[in-house]
């Protein structure tokens, strides 16, 4: 006999992951997605898990917070991360994907699962209390549902502004000017690099600052606050002459062999560019390239004019221009438990960026936890929290304020949080060396999750997702 059906609203990264976890545990799922009936300011397709900003999931190495989070998700057979691994493109030490193949594969896998029923319509309200429901509508939740969520929580939503970088055709780049390299020669030479001298950099910065901005809606103009990890490039430029050079345009660790001996200090200081614009592959063939760190709210005509001032991009043809959009998130510390259940309704979950986690892997982590817990609830069992020692657990603890990390004052100023070693509990023994400390965090996480997985397996039948994938 099948368990009671669970409703998942939103087929982004979190919703797709949640639906997969539920279905693989034997729980039927109704997955509701409003696209293509209604789109958003940032989406371009109707595929599930469309990546609207970067195509990167962050650092691969588990001695980085993003890498440890990915490792934990692989351990629990995350649909999102396993699919990302399958459609990865070269990106140095990061996990980046061919976004078209990635989202198409997610859609196909979920569409072909016998326990997943897909419905394409706009969900206008929160379903009745009879339904186990996961809200995974993301930062671009449609207005009608957003208002219903505000009515339910009694709290106005929070928001910030996010932006996406332009994508250009690889064959429109001047290959005589750009060079292939990864920073510090880490991994394959995954990036194309556009070097700039000081004069060109100064001129480029001035044009960025003076460039005409796209119009914001009236309600957006009232509070155009940005998320620091995804600032528009023109906003970074305004912060100081050298701010871009120590951010997305830094030249440190990048070297073109044509410039001569890297280890000749005099030559290195003479030849090293003042700044470098990096281009990252969007697909394996390199036909499409993303301008790394070039999120922007410039008008499209201004993007074409100004970005063609970059050496090597004088004749660049744009597949997609950068855009800025308003992202909504819940004031989660006042609303959610570490299980991702709403405090005031145990069979209603929230997952993904709407909860205030930042980053693709973090969204998948929320979907994974919400899916597991909705499955447990459907089976009449008690939802679980991930171990504090894990990156998944630490993120969920932060957004739910489990360990009182946020003071009452800061709870009123809750802002999205990416994976960070600053969230995990301190080690019992202080380790000064950062690399060794991060390695210890990783080892502690692995041990805690092994114990947690064994206990979780006992809650499910032998065919549960943790032991046998559909």
Swiss-Prot record:
Residues bound to FAD: 10-15
Known function: Catalyzes the folate-dependent formation of 5-methyl-uridine at position 54 (M-5-U54) in all tRNAs.
Family designation: Belongs to the MnmG family. TrmFO subfamily.
Name of this protein: Methylenetetrahydrofolate--tRNA-(uracil-5-)-methyltransferase TrmFO
Keyword terms: Cytoplasm, FAD, Flavoprotein, Methyltransferase, NAD, NADP, Transferase, tRNA processing
EC number, as in UniProt: 2.1.1.74
GO biological process: tRNA methylation; tRNA wobble uridine modification
Source species of the chain: Prochlorococcus marinus (strain MIT 9301)
Uppermost EC category: transferase
Subcellular location: Cytoplasm
InterPro entries, per the entry: FAD/NAD-bd_sf, MnmG-rel, MnmG-rel_CS, MnmG_N, TrmFO
Cofactor(s) the protein requires to work: FAD
A GO cellular component entry from the record: cytosol
């Amino acid at each position: 006999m099948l368990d009671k059906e669970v409703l998942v609203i939103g087929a982004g990264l979190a919703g797709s992951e949640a639906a997969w976890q539920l279905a693989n545990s034997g729980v039927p799922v109704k997955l509701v997605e409003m696209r293509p009936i209604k789109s958003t300011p940032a989406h371009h397709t109707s595929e599930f898990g469309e990546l609207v900003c970067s195509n990167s999931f962050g650092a691969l190495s588990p001695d980085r917070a993003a890498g440890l989070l990915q490792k934990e998700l692989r351990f629990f057979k995350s649909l999102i991360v396993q699919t990302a691994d399958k459609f990865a493109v070269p990106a140095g030490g990061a996990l980046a994907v061919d976004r078209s193949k990635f989202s198409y594969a997610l859609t196909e896998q979920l569409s072909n699962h016998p326990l997943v029923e897909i419905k394409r319509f706009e969900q206008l309200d929160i379903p009745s209390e009879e339904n186990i429901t996961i809200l995974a509508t993301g930062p671009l939740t449609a207005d009608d549902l957003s208002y219903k969520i505000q009515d339910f929580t009694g709290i106005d939503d929070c928001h910030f502004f996010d932006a996406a970088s332009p994508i250009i055709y690889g064959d429109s780049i001047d290959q005589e000017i750009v060079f292939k390299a990864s920073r510090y020669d880490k991994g394959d030479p995954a990036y194309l690099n556009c070097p700039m001298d000081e004069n060109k950099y100064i001129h480029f910065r001035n044009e960025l600052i003076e460039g005409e901005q796209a119009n914001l809606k009236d309600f957006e103009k009232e509070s155009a606050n940005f998320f620091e990890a995804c600032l528009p490039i023109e906003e970074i430029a305004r912060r100081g002459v050298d701010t871009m050079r120590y951010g997305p345009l830094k030249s440190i660790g990048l070297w073109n062999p044509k410039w001569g001996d890297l280890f000749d200090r005099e030559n290195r200081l003479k030849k090293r560019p003042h700044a470098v614009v990096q281009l990252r592959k969007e697909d394996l063939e390199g036909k499409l390239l993303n301008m790394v760190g070039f999120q922007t709210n410039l008008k499209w005509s201004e993007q074409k004019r100004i970005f063609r001032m970059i050496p090597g991009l004088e004749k660049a043809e744009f597949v997609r221009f950068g855009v800025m959009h308003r992202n909504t998130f819940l004031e989660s510390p006042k609303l959610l438990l570490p299980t991702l259940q709403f405090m005031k309704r145990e069979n209603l979950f929230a997952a993904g960026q709407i909860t205030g986690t930042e980053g693709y892997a973090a969204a998948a982590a929320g979907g994974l936890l919400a899916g597991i817990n909705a499955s447990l609830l459907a089976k009449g069992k008690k939802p679980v929290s991930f171990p504090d020692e894990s990156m998944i657990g630490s993120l969920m603890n932060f957004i739910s304020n489990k360990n009182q990390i946020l003071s009452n004052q800061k709870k009123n100023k809750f802002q999205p949080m990416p994976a960070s070693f600053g969230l995990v509990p301190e080690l019992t023994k202080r380790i000064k060396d950062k690399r060794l400390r991060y390695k210890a965090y990783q080892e502690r996480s692995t041990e805690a999750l092994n114990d947690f997985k064994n206990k979780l397996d006992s809650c499910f039948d032998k065919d549960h997702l943790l032991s046998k994938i559909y």
